[in-house]
Amino acid sequence: GGVAWRYAVNHPERLTHLILLSPMSPYGFGGTRGEEGRMYDERGWGSPGGFANPAFLQKLGEQDRGDDPMAARAVLEKSLFAAGWPVDKAWQDLYVDELLKIHLGEDYYPGDYQPLAEFPYVLPGTRGISNALAPQYANVSAFAQINPHPPVLWIRGAKDTLVSDQSYSDLAVLGQLGVVPGYPGAEAFPPQPMVGQTRAVLEQYKENGGRYSELVFEHSAHASHLEEPERFVDELKAFIAG
C-alpha cells in the first residue's frame, strides 16, 4: 500500500487504475493523530520507526521455523489472517521461508532508532526499512491532489489488526493494553485512526475530481486476497472491466 500510494503521487500519468489492498495510512505508521494526520512533532514522536520486538528479531536471526509465539510462523499467522482461519501448511511454509530471507540490522530490518526517556521510549531513526514508514518520511497525503485521476479500489478486511483504527502494532494501543508501560492517556496520545485517515484522503481525492470505492471483506484480516480469494478476484475483474 505504501509503495502504491507513493508511485501514484510520483507518476499519476502512468496509472489507469489503482488498487489498494489493506494499505498503510497515507500519513505513515504511527506518530500522527486525527483523520487529518497531524504529527505530534517533527521527530516522529509516537512512531516506532526502526524498533521491533527483540524476541521476534532473535527468532528471525535464528531462522526459527517452529511454533514459538515470537517465531515467524506465529507472527505471520497473527498479523495476516483472521483468528481461526485455516492456513494451508504449504502456503504457510512458503511465507515463512520468504520472511526468513530478510536481512537484519540497522541498515535493513528493522533499522535504527533513538532511545527516549519517556513513553513510548523510542523515536524513529534515519536508516532501515521500518523507518521508511515513519510520518516524517512516509506522508503521501498529496495523493488527494494528483491529476489525472485514476479510479481507486480500496479493499480492506474487517478483522485486520495490523492496519486498523485500533492496530495492535500502534504504540498507543499497546499502551492502553498495558503492554508498553507509562501510557499518558488517550487525550495526550490517542490511537492512530489508520482507516479513517485513508478514507479522509480518498474523500479529498473525490472532491478534487477522482473516484474511489471502499470494499470491506467481513471475514478477512490483512490478507483478503488469500482469505477470500474468489470474491477478491471477482471484485478485481469487475473493477478493471468497469
Residue ranges, per PLM feature:
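A structural motif corresponding to the C-terminal end of an alpha-helix
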Residues: A144-P148, V201-E214
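Short catalytic/ligand-binding loop motif for oxyanion handling, primarily in non-cytosolic enzymes
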Residues: G2-A4, P26-F29, T161-S164, H222-H225
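Conserved hydrolase catalytic core segment
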Residues: G1-R38
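Core-facing hydrophobic residues within beta-strands of well-ordered domains
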Residues: L15-T16, R211-Y212, S220
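Alpha/beta-hydrolase
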Residues: G37-Q197
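Catalytic histidine-centered segment of alpha/beta-hydrolase-like enzymes
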Residues: V180-P190, F217-P229, V233
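C-terminal alpha-helix
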Residues: E235-G242
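Hydrophobic/aromatic beta-strand patches that form the interior of the parallel beta-sheet core
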Residues: I19, L153-I155, L215
